[in-house]
Amino acid sequence: MIKITLKDGKVLEVEKGLTVSEIAARISTSLRKKALGAKINGEKAELMDVINEDSTLEILTFEDQEGKDTLRHTASHILAQAVKRLYPEVKLAIGPSIENGFYYDFDAEFSFTPEILEKIEKEMNKIVKENLQLKKFTKSREDAINFMKERNEDYKVELIEDLPEESIISFYEQGDFVDLCAGPHVPSTKEVKAIKLLSVAGAYWRGNENNKMLQRIYGTAFTKKAELEEYLHMLEEAKKRDHRKLGKELGLFDLKEEGPGFPFFYPKGMILRNTLENYWREMHEKAGYGEIRTPIILNEKLWHQSGHWDHYKENMYFTKIDGEDYAIKPMNCPGSILVYKSDLHSYRELPIRLGELGLVHRHEYSGALHGLMRVRNFTQDDAHIFMTKEQITSEILGVIKMIDNFYSLFGFEYFVELSTRPEDSMGSDEDWEAATNGLIKALNEAGLEYKINEGDGAFYGPKIDFHLRDCLGRTWQCGTIQLDFQMPERFDLSYVGADGEKHRPVMAHRVIFGSIERFIGILTEHYAGAFPTWLAPVQVKIMNITDNQVEYCKEIQKVLNENGIRVELDLRNEKIGYKIREAQLQKIPYMLVLGDKEMNEKTIAVRARKQGDLGAMNLTDFVAMVKKEIEEKTNCL
């Protein structure tokens, strides 16, 4: 007998040689039916894997992200098999699972039209019904290369040739189809009960613009048709909320071919942006942060010293000034470090909190650009805290509380991930362990549940990531807290301790917006452009019924302006119904309709974006109501 320790700590004694699937059945029949994969001793595994020794075991279902990934990875193989059945001459590239779905890249001499996608999807459903078993086998590197050459799969050959000579190469077979793959997969194609192809896009082979442009087919898969229908409904709603579409329609922002990845903000968009930035400043001033501004372009030597040159060079832009090499900053931290280092500091001054709304530039491939969500220049709301080791927990707790208050204001729920040391990192094991333990302690004291994201930390330290969940259930990674023992060492930072000696401070990097541009994109979709009154670029629209009320409209506008309310006049010679519809399309919180009756009685007729007609109101009462909404930052979701 062997001992199997489950995720909840329970221990099962079972016979040696059982499969994961058989052990799942011992736990419960319902779990076996829902199981899609597993983790054995923390490593990804499949349901048909055999366990012969004491092990830890986690059964994965569709409720787990790894379970979703396993199912959708198999769906990508089903897609590739369907394409090869219908179009044998097409060459295969890669096909991973991704967030909310999967894709496969193909080299085809024809375009995948909507009609062809429909044909492929029918073939995929046929493959699902065939209940094909997925079987893993391995070959030596040399045999694997020859195997793929015989199949004319040039892209697979290239991938294998890049691996070390001693590599053992794994493949998966399902019926008449074989693909190069490390796995894991579900046992059979029948597990993929609901599948849908979504779109086609261009993608350079291996993400390199110098390589051939392939065709990438995107799809998604679920274990239940009802879940697929719900997801497709969400996608339709997301299209209506697309920030790129709303940004143009509402006159907020745009992206142009003259500056790919470099956003243009229009006057209304700048009002929204400035309102957010001013709130950020207000919040940070209350929390004891000093705001700084550091240069966009800094000498290349600084980036060698910081480590960015070795770990981040491919994402940076460079220029020459007076014959010397300079870099356009991709991050704000070295500048903040120079500000700290410009003076001597005593332990009595710590913690020192410095915040910056800093413009950074990072190179992204053109194919990766997406509205405000993925750009090449953006404003990052960085703050850096310089502190003693004893202050770590209290400072990180303070940041967590600030982030929680900030996201709650906008109606966001969130979940937390702790990302640990990546392969490409700098610093000692001891420093990484101390930094990671410091973050864990703060998370535990804050009472936050979190997931470990192995190997996804920054190159200089572990981090806590905050993932927002919007009103459609989509998640967005925004806030980050990173603990850093490396930068203070590299820049020889110090403070004078109570003993009169120099000591090394600990540094924390943190952002809340992440990128202001991206956060605005997320907010635009979250609210579908109908921003709460305090954020709305235009808070009140005043419209007349006839020319008789023009002067009265201007009087009302003056009073609102004097009370700090953002207002627009619509005095066009149009029907009032048309004006109201247009204001509704512009998603303006309040509309004031002024006719002879309102003018004579010195009242206003109020329409609210959400509640509709509110009837006649006294102007003083209306001003008080709107100002209260603005001051309290009422969320209108």
UniProtKB/Swiss-Prot annotation:
Catalytic activity as recorded in UniProt: tRNA(Thr) + L-threonine + ATP = L-threonyl-tRNA(Thr) + AMP + diphosphate + H(+)
Gene (name only): thrS
SUPFAM superfamilies: Class II aaRS ABD-related, Class II aaRS and biotin synthetases, TGS-like, ThrRS/AlaRS common domain
Catalytic activity, EC: 6.1.1.3
Region Catalytic, annotated ranges: 242-532
Residues holding Zn(2+): 333, 384, 509
InterPro entries assigned: aa-tRNA-synt_IIb (IPR002314), aa-tRNA-synth_II (IPR006195), aa-tRNA-synth_II/BPL/LPL (IPR045864), Anticodon-bd (IPR004154), Anticodon-bd_dom_sf (IPR036621), Beta-grasp_dom_sf (IPR012675), TGS (IPR004095), TGS-like (IPR012676)
Subcellular location: Cytoplasm
Bound cofactor: record note: Binds 1 zinc ion per subunit.
Species the sequence originates in: Clostridium novyi (strain NT)
Molecular function terms from GO: ATP binding; catalytic activity, acting on a protein; metal ion binding; threonine-tRNA ligase activity; transferase activity; tRNA binding
Single GO cellular component term: cytoplasm
Record keywords, A-Z: Aminoacyl-tRNA synthetase, ATP-binding, Cytoplasm, Ligase, Metal-binding, Nucleotide-binding, Protein biosynthesis, RNA-binding, tRNA-binding, Zinc
Keyword Nucleotide-binding: yes
Residue ranges annotated for the TGS domain, each copy included: 1-61
Description of how the protein assembles with itself and partners: Homodimer.
Transmembrane segments: none
Positions of disulphide bridges: none
Gene3D superfamilies xrefs: 3.10.20.30, 3.30.54.20, Anticodon-binding domain (3.40.50.800), Bira Bifunctional Protein, Domain 2 (3.30.930.10), Threonyl-trna Synthetase, Chain A, domain 2 (3.30.980.10)
Cofactor: Zn(2+)
Similarity comment text for this entry: Belongs to the class-II aminoacyl-tRNA synthetase family.
SMART domains: tRNA_SAD
Known role: Catalyzes the attachment of threonine to tRNA(Thr) in a two-step reaction: L-threonine is first activated by ATP to form Thr-AMP and then transferred to the acceptor end of tRNA(Thr). Also edits incorrectly charged L-seryl-tRNA(Thr).
Domain of life: Bacteria
GO term, biological process aspect, one: threonyl-tRNA aminoacylation
PANTHER family: THREONINE--TRNA LIGASE, CHLOROPLASTIC_MITOCHONDRIAL 2, THREONINE-TRNA LIGASE
Protein name per the record: Threonine--tRNA ligase
Pfam families: HGTP_anticodon, TGS, tRNA-synt_2b, tRNA_SAD
